[in-house]
Amino acid sequence: MSDTPEAPIVEAGPVGRLLQSQNLSVESLGRDASGVEMIKVDRDRLLAVCQTLYADGFNYLRCQAAYDSGPGQDLVSTYHLIKLSDNADRPPEVRIKVFVPRDDPRVPSVYWIWKTADWQERESYDMFGIVYEGHPNLKRILMPEDWVGWPLRKDYITPDFYELQEAY
């Protein structure tokens, strides 16, 4: 008998089953507090998963965001997708999560599927240093271009001084 508790088995929801039926390897993470299905996707399968979901009607990227799991742990890029249609009171939603190592934080850009990813991916890059490969204009959006580091990482050390330049 093991002293470590076993993780509960989480059954795939409707979106997870759809992706599995398309031979896309994903892991169900259950549902969030709002009841939205959450799915973990490897970064090398992200574009195939997103193209499948777009073809299935998930036509709106409500939010792309990122967070830091903690010092020495993974960075996470998240995608909240919705099927928008006429007269939908509660449209289907899903949240995709891609976990990447902080020493190699690369994820394919979904800009070419949902244009709303443009500034959202840039913000995640600017704050966490996640590189969205294939993004047409991946550069800082909030911090000065010469800023060193990624301010929302939990291991970020704030500089004592930063000299602002005069605007002309």
Swiss-Prot record:
Cellular compartments annotated: Cellular thylakoid membrane
Molecular function in Gene Ontology: NADH dehydrogenase (ubiquinone) activity; quinone binding
Protein's GO biological process: photosynthesis, light reaction
PROSITE patterns reported in the protein's UniProt record: COMPLEX1_30K
Membrane topology: Peripheral membrane protein
SUPFAM superfamilies for this protein: Nqo5-like
Tagged with keyword Membrane: yes
Domain of life, source organism: Bacteria
InterPro entries associated with the record: NADH_DH_suC (IPR010218), NADH_quin_OxRdtase_su_C/D-like (IPR037232), NADH_UbQ_OxRdtase_30kDa_su (IPR001268), NADH_UbQ_OxRdtase_CS (IPR020396)
Catalysed transformations (reactions): a plastoquinone + NADH + (n+1) H(+)(in) = a plastoquinol + NAD(+) + n H(+)(out); a plastoquinone + NADPH + (n+1) H(+)(in) = a plastoquinol + NADP(+) + n H(+)(out)
Any single GO CC term annotated in Swiss-Prot or TrEMBL for this entry: plasma membrane-derived thylakoid membrane
UniProt KW keywords: Membrane, NAD, NADP, Plastoquinone, Quinone, Thylakoid, Translocase, Transport
Record-listed E.C. numbers: 7.1.1.-
Enzyme class: translocase
Family per record: Belongs to the complex I 30 kDa subunit family.
Functional note: NDH-1 shuttles electrons from an unknown electron donor, via FMN and iron-sulfur (Fe-S) centers, to quinones in the respiratory and/or the photosynthetic chain. The immediate electron acceptor for the enzyme in this species is believed to be plastoquinone. Couples the redox reaction to proton translocation, and thus conserves the redox energy in a proton gradient. Cyanobacterial NDH-1 also plays a role in inorganic carbon-concentration.
Assembly: NDH-1 can be composed of about 15 different subunits; different subcomplexes with different compositions have been identified which probably have different functions.
Name of the protein this chain belongs to: NAD(P)H-quinone oxidoreductase subunit J
